[in-house]
């Protein structure tokens, strides 16, 4: 469909949606007594556009297809996590029981197309050198610009052994790469543990902040004294998946008091999550947290809590900026809205969704941190001694270690 048709018909669908949101009846009379933010005045403009389309446009467009696209755009203009699902999409969405094979990509739709937030280490996507910041232009024949985030996530899943083709736009390349990936059953490695400085620095890197991985971190923190560990380096780079409840629990391991996070929405009463001294494990050991642009959601909550409570130094890059609570609203025609109804805030009141977390020590990424090597590392049971490949030294890791070395335990 010509671009002008899409633009004009966007206005048509907005008329209908605004009318629904604001309570306008079939005669154009508002159920409310006062206009809200001038929205009612805009309805007259949209109606005029509709009149011109009906009387002057060159051809009869497919109203259903364009309206669906306009509704997707309306939801996506709110934030990257909100989605509109057509009746067909929502039926497929409800039928998805989870646990399917995946390719190891955490995605967002902040920039129109699907963008890679982070990649699971060792996954098919990781082995294909897909990295955070890459743009997924298409999944098979489906242009990601024209489908919702929920459906993009659904298309990335499938049965083990099945293939999918991604069209990936990479920085500094003019043409997209066609990459074929084979879906595999999701497997997450245990928390990586490495020791530095004669075991005085305990390095921990989870791949996800779920119950199992947070429990692994808990056990390692509890064993620090026995192992002779005196300082902690928590690597949350490219950690984008997990659970906010588990993230709150992880932050509490390092805090005996203070606010961990807050959650608030237009119709969601403000909740404040406070540290419980009985659940704290180590509140005195020096801590440095590594973050980058692939740090999102639960990992951002942890980073913000430790930063604002002055419990840790943050090193790396500004994080992605994701932290909203969603709710699904079913519509009469079988369609649905996935709408952000509340946003998480840091202890200082910054919305994670809008602002992300900015480290006190900014260090640009110069290497794929999953393959970085530090010659001072001491292998542990959970990490075999690596070979010494020719890779660039991880400057973010080096800076974090330097900070910890200079801190008194």
Language-model features, listed with the residues they occupy:
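Terminal targeting/pro-maturation regions of precursor/exported proteins
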Residues: 2-82, 109-110, 114, 229, ...
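Cleft-lining beta-strand/loop regions that shape enzyme active-site pockets
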Residues: 31-42, 48-58, 62-63, 115-118, ...
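A residue-level signal for conserved active-site and pocket-lining positions in enzyme catalytic cores
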Residues: 49, 105, 400
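PDZ/PDZ-like peptide-tail recognition elements
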Residues: 69, 77-118
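Short capping micro-motif at the N-terminus of alpha-helices
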Residues: 146, 179, 263, 339, ...
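Conserved functional hotspot residues or short segments at active or partner-binding sites
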Residues: 336, 343, 347-409
């Amino acid at each position: 469909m010509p671009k002008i048709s899409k633009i004009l018909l966007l206005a048509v669908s907005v008329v209908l949606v605004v009318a629904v949101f604001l309570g306008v009846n079939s005669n154009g009379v508002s159920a409310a007594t006062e206009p809200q933010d001038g929205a009612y005045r805009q309805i007259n403009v949209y109606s005029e556009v509709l009149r011109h389309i009906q009387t002057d446009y060159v051809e009869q467009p497919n109203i259903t297809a364009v309206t669906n696209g306009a509704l997707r755009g309306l939801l996506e203009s709110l934030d990257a996590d909100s989605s509109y699902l057509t009746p067909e999409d929502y039926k497929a969405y409800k039928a998805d029981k989870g646990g399917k094979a995946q390719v190891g990509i955490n995605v967002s739709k902040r920039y129109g197309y699907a963008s890679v937030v982070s990649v699971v280490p060792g996954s098919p996507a990781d082995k294909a050198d897909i990295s955070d910041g890459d743009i997924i232009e298409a999944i098979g024949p489906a242009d990601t610009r024209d489908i919702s985030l929920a459906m993009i996530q659904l298309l990335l899943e499938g049965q083990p052994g099945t293939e999918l083709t991604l069209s990936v736009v990479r920085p500094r390349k003019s043409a997209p790469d066609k990459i074929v990936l084979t879906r595999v059953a999701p497997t997450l490695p245990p928390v990586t543990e490495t020791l530095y400085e004669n075991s005085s620095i305990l390095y921990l890197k989870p791949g996800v902040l779920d119950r199992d991985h947070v429990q692994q971190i808990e056990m390692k923190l509890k064993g620090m004294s026995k192992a002779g560990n005196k300082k902690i380096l928590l690597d949350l780079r490219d950690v984008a998946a997990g659970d906010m409840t588990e993230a709150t629990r992880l932050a509490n391991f390092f805090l005996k008091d203070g606010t961990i996070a807050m959650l608030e929405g237009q119709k969601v009463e403000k909740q404040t999550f406070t540290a419980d001294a009985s659940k704290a494990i180590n509140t005195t050991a020096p801590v440095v947290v590594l973050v980058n642009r692939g740090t999102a959601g639960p990992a951002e909550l942890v980073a913000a809590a430790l930063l604002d409570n002055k419990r840790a130094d943050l090193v790396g890059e500004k994080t992605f900026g994701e932290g909203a609570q969603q709710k699904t609203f079913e519509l009469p025609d079988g369609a649905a809205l996935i709408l952000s109804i509340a946003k998480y805030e840091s202890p200082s009141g910054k919305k994670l969704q809008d602002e992300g977390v900015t480290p006190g020590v900014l260090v640009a990424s110069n290497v794929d941190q999953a393959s970085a090597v530090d010659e001072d590392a001491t292998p542990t049971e959970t990490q075999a001694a690596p070979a010494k490949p020719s890779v660039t030294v991880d400057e973010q890791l080096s800076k974090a270690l330097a900070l910890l070395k200079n801190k008194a335990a």
